[in-house]
Amino acid sequence: MTREVAGRPRRACPDCGYVHFTDPKVGVGVLVVEDGRVLLVRRAVEPERGKWSMPAGYLDHGEDPRATAAREALEETGLTVTIEGLLDVFYNPPGRGGASIFILYRARCLAGEPTAGDDADDARFFPLDALPDLAFPSTRAAIKLVRESTD
């Protein structure tokens, strides 16, 4: 059953009145920039298969978003990174698939060479002025932020 709570219809238990609030999916990404080059991964899965994006994935229950960012970088690129700070937070309206909230961190590479893994089939650094076909509005927005900060 549903009932109106806080101005919206919410699923609620008819017996005890417990209201179920649907949590958004949260994605976390990492942007690594070195010597005017940005780390990107080519997506091996849909959506946007074959296009390039930042290493990213879903936040696991109970996981710190900064840890998610570092974990995704390691899983998708083989690189160990340190998180330097929050770059931006993006909102993706419901119904478009993927994460509703996307948290993007800036990071620095500590060790390793880019080697694709997990749901990426390639990983490498690209000059900011010679980027491949990018996936997702958040990837394009992140690149724009980096370009603006280096101008």
Language-model segments: residues:
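Acidic, metal-coordinating catalytic segment for phosphate/diphosphate chemistry
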Residues: M1-V30
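A short Gly-Trp-Pro
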Residues: H20, E34, P55, L104-R106
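Conserved Nudix-box catalytic region and its N-terminal flanking loop in Nudix hydrolases
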Residues: V33-E75
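A generic structural signal for short beta-strands and their flanking turns/coil linkers
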Residues: P9, V26-V28, E48-G50, L79-G85, ...
